């Protein structure tokens, strides 16, 4: 069998046609483990936010119990920050600068997800904000869809290390991520309309509500953007 041509200066394990791995085997395993640890910590932050939102949308919710849940979100976000730094420090091997840059870009973008989770929780507590009760079901739905999005994103990132060729040939998982983002957009638009139709709310209250809605839905947008980054990364490795 003819071996794939590897241009001079390209580390072993990386082929110009997007081989099954981006790095040499040992380095591939190391970086795979580090970035998946980071994504797990980001996911834990999202799960903590889900608990916070569930408590904030429960009947009779008050601000004091949310303070402790907000603290949990912030602690999880800090852990995700530490994981990001650890992952970046692990990118010290002899592989293509473009690969290093792509991985850092994906990791730092995912870290923004944890940051947004923290923003939602702490700002809601600081401002003692609660979504209008009529919107609670839709807010919960947005969080649920966003979690599904992130689960798919985590799987797609993992495939970069173990099923690279498969992902190059069939990136339907990235389309699924974008499809879920469209679902979030649809629910977001409905909530926008719902809020501005509430005669009992002052304009300032409506603007505050849609501002928090924007921040919450930004998480879904970031996940979609990371999916786009992955697809660009794949395209750049096809010759």
Where are these regions (language model features)?
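Cytosolic, long alpha-helical scaffolding segments
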Residues: 17-239
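Short, Lys/Arg-enriched N-terminal segments with co-localized hydrophobic residues
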Residues: 3, 8-21
